Amino acid sequence: MNMFSSLMLASLSVLTLPIMSSILNTHKNSTYPHHVKNIISYAFITSLVPTMMFIHSGQETIISNWHWMTIQTLKLSLSFKLDYFSMIFVPVALFVTWSIMEFSLWYMHSDPYITRFFKYLLTFLITMMILVTANNLFQLFIGWEGVGIMSFLLIGWWYGRTDANTAALQAILYNRIGDIGFIMAMAWFLFNTNTWDLQQIFMLDPNLTNLPLLGLLLAATGKSAQFGLHPWLPSAMEGPTPVSALLHSSTMVVAGVFLLIRFHPLMENNKTIQSLTLCLGAITTLFTAICALTQNDIKKIIAFSTSSQLGLMIVTIGINQPYLAFLHICTHAFFKAMLFMCSGSIIHSLNDEQDIRKMGGLFNAMPFTTTSLIIGSLALTGMPFLTGFYSKDLIIETANTSYTNAWALLMTLIATSLTAVYSTRIIFFALLGQPRFLPLTTINENNPFLINSIKRLLIGSIFAGFFISNNIYPTTIPEMTMPIYMKLTALTVTILGFTLALELSLITHNLKLEHPTNMFKFSNLLGYYPTIMHRLPPLANLSMSQKSASLLLDSIWLENILPKSISQFQMKTSILISTQKGQIKLYFLSFLITLTLSMLLFNLHE
Amino acid sequence: MSLAHINIFLAFTVSLVGLLMYRSHLMSSLLCLEGMMLSLFVMATMVVLNTHFTLASMMPIILLVFAACERALGLSLLVMVSNTYGVDHVQNLNLLQC
């Protein structure tokens, strides 16, 4: 009798302890944030044990705890699915969250509501764990909505700022549109497979799964910011940097991809949906990489980088490689969170300056942050044998050697090289050159919280890929043999991107600033997508509904059709055809004479 | 024709001439129009009663009703003209405006 299920449940339930303590009002004291951070580190260590047991034995578990209700033939219960995906994701997520909590002890140090902040982050983590370990769609939906709500509360943390409120509302609205797809999928599964349990759905293996998979794809588009529902992710950078690091890089936005990965037994039989996901992911990754090229806010560039990597994950699902996508989720969490934390360190040191045109020369002033930023960027672009290499290179290789859409593949490769371009841009503007910030600096990165948290993620960014890849059991076999030019494709385009970006930056650094070209404006304004879609459809909708509701019935049918139209018609025609001048007496007199004459004529004719 | 008939007929003709030939006021032609209606009414009643044509005894009543409507219409036109100009002189009606 091993302690697999007990330890996993213990690890998940210790996370809820600090929330319970708010009932006892112990959360008002100032050590509450440290308390939360320690709880998460304990949960992480506790969850390592079941994970290592799982790696050793390959034993998957389903824990069905509590039967909630039965509605006619649908049985709803609290069940946790501890399989490959959730067992590996939970320690990774807990590790990253531990580092982010420690980072936010430094970052949010001067915030008066820091305990509330930590409570929100913890609630977010709990709902994310619910999402990841859910065995039925209902529990998954609870986690799904939970992360959406916490995202709203955390993006709008500084609610005095209008932009933050707008961004939080935008996140909710775009996620809601995705939720329509989710609910449609739930309804379809309820009707056709009579259940919301994943096991029964996969066992029944329904034939025509186009509709539910389209619904799940829409849900993933909304939650993971794919093209069409993507503008909320760059706007979500209005929240504090720990929020961006946790939610919008590692954990929440991968929920959509995670959903599609969960349903991979259904997706591998449906070629149409695979092509759709492939094209959607390819468009997303290229579009957001283009948008990232000319942004000036460091957090927005990293947000677009996240969006581009999410598109890459969706592409991986589209070529029927869910395990590779999952590996990329896990490795991406490390270096993306670290990139955000480094940008947070830079921002705080430069007194809340987020514009990269006003940074520079930090290479010597902040060595530790510089190191981790460069290593994070190298890991992101897939530098051989760092973390990103183990997932990203495998993805590109598999895409190259599989029977897939050449256009999608080309877009993915271009986006890979653009990844290197904008990473170089960040490094060049923020770290190299002469300082462009104000002389009175407050650059200080000597806080142990900051250093320890970034150091942990740094070690993770370097070694986690190797560590995870060597310890998971074999799933889909990657392609082992390919021509050498295909093997080196990812590396080549990345080095090409680096070189190009560096050369361009160095050459144009001292040139005169020109008027922005059309391409520049397209990239800077996010492809005009938010400008058009946030103004035109709401205006059209609202004006159409106003016209049909008030104008159509009242003023047209009741007023205009008969009464006013008749009066106007009469007036117009009478003006048109009247030739009289109002000489009434003349008309009457002529009438009388005619009458008299005709009577005389007819009477005296005999 | 008998003398009564000629009398009524003459009344009708006088009113007709008065309707068609008037000097300046629109009211006078409206009055003559009423006179025409009245003489027609009397003529119709006399004929119906003399020939005992009972079935047609509705006709004068209906004629009166329609005369009332027409009276109202004529008076409303008069009021419109009078609203614009203050007096109902016919020479004012040379501007056909809508």
Curated annotation (Swiss-Prot), chain B:
One Gene Ontology MF term = NADH dehydrogenase (ubiquinone) activity
Query: According to its record, what are the GO cellular component terms?
Result: mitochondrial inner membrane; respiratory chain complex I
Its main localization is mitochondrion
Q: Which Pfam families match?
A: Oxidored_q2
Q: Which organism is it from?
A: Equus asinus
Q: What name goes with this protein?
A: NADH-ubiquinone oxidoreductase chain 4L
- Reaction catalysed? a ubiquinone + NADH + 5 H(+)(in) = a ubiquinol + NAD(+) + 4 H(+)(out)
Q: Which GO terms describe its biological process?
A: ATP synthesis coupled electron transport
